[in-house]
Amino acid sequence: MKHIVKHIHFVGIGGAGMSGIAEVLVNLGYQVSGSDLARNAVTDRLAALGARIAIGHDAANIEGANAVVVSTAVRSDNPEVLAARAQRVPIVQRAVMLAELMRLKQGIAIAGTHGKTTTTSLVASVLAAGGLDPTFVIGGRLISAGANARLGTGDFIVAEADESDASFLNLYPVIEVITNIDADHMDTYGHDFARLKQAFIEFTQRLPFYGSAVVCVDDPNVRQIIPFISKPVVRYGLSPDAQVRAEDIDARDGRMHFTVIREGRAPLAVVLNLPGLHNVQNALAAIAIATDLGVSDDAIQQALAEFNGVGRRFQRYGDVPTADGGRYTLIDDYGHHPVEMAATIAAARGAFPGRRLVLAFQPHRYTRTRDCFDDFVNVLSTVDALVLTEVYAAGEAAIATANGDALSRALRAAGKVEPVFVETVDALPEALAKVAQDGDVVITMGAGSIGGVPAKIVQNTQQKG
């Protein structure tokens, strides 16, 4: 590619999916430019690496580019897209560019409705501990690396495979992981769950004859598609028929202790530096791949015990003073689907038994809130105290029956929790200061602008101190 394409421009370069690919391309020696609506830590990092960053979208930003990379979130009337089309500069989907990177190495693609980012991070960390020095592209910041992407010298590239827009069908990896299949982003599949499952089957058909599908048999929908997978399958999970499974699971001190049972191998005692059964499952996927690639048991154990997590995935911000002189524990999480939220809440209950759980939640997308409305009411009713904000639209038109006020009314009618509703995330720090008590565990959760709230709370605390 490099002899023809030297300058690559990214529209929306600050996004999690785009920035990782851009960083790898910078490190491969390409000239990279990009634009976004606002400056952030990601754009600053890319600029420091040598990328040319523009704030705001303008036709002039693509000057000299041989290719323009876009995601499905970029509108067709974006001025940079229009300029590229007028100048006959190829417009490349993000997943297609990721597929080009995978052609340079052997790809390990992590798919599934939930758990992709954490599983990708665990796989990359375990392979790195085993000396394989993988390249990785992750949808969140791997805390140990300080970035969501890295160019390694090894043979493998580990990346998330996105089913939300069916773009994972552009990838041709040698190993695939399917963590679970759940009803999300159903607009892509015509609100037909059978079509979504068929897309995952087609994803496995991208594997070469020597490839393998590493699948979680605890998920009933994944289990249903196994008979239709024509390539070798490795089953992992907590189920008795899993080839890589966890037994004797014990949650202690925010960590998961368990024994891994693998066919033809001695039992392996593991301490995972993450809470929650869902993270045990995610770790099993990494263990299955690492075992197949010859990573030593010692390296597997070390990587999982020392795993520092991923930004916005049960990320701990430490203890914060309360108004009455006590302290509460602050955690931030990206969960935005009821299934993810339930798993995180369960993990918090296990990590902090007996403590009051306060949730600050910003729903993400009106369509998701509408489609999962009853499930949101059920999962939000399981916390001890709730602060709710208006829905983060993500470009969607508002739906009056699926906005924050409608969700608040439904929660009050359910009668299990009395939500405190605030219109904006800017009001969250003050609202939480009134709600939080000594000894509480406070979780800020959502995929939108709520991600900036924990740092704001910490900053406010430091200024007062």
Swiss-Prot record:
Catalytic reactions of this protein: UDP-N-acetyl-alpha-D-muramate + L-alanine + ATP = UDP-N-acetyl-alpha-D-muramoyl-L-alanine + ADP + phosphate + H(+)
Alphabetical list of Pfam families matching this protein: Mur_ligase (PF01225), Mur_ligase_C (PF02875), Mur_ligase_M (PF08245)
Principal location: cytoplasm
An example Gene Ontology biological process: peptidoglycan biosynthetic process
Gene Ontology CC annotations of this record: cytoplasm
EC number: 6.3.2.8
Keyword Protein transport belongs to the record: no
Domain of life: Bacteria
Keywords from the UniProt entry: ATP-binding, Cell cycle, Cell division, Cell shape, Cell wall biogenesis/degradation, Cytoplasm, Ligase, Nucleotide-binding, Peptidoglycan synthesis
Keyword flag Cell wall biogenesis/degradation: yes
Pathway stated in the Swiss-Prot or TrEMBL entry: Cell wall biogenesis; peptidoglycan biosynthesis
Gene Ontology molecular function, alphabetical: ATP binding; UDP-N-acetylmuramate-L-alanine ligase activity
Localization per record: Cytoplasm
Binding site for ATP: G112, T113, H114, G115, K116, T117, T118
UniProt-listed NCBIfam families: murC
The family this protein is said to belong to: Belongs to the MurCDEF family.
Function description: Cell wall formation.
Name this protein carries in UniProt: UDP-N-acetylmuramate--L-alanine ligase
Protein species of origin: Burkholderia multivorans (strain ATCC 17616 / 249)
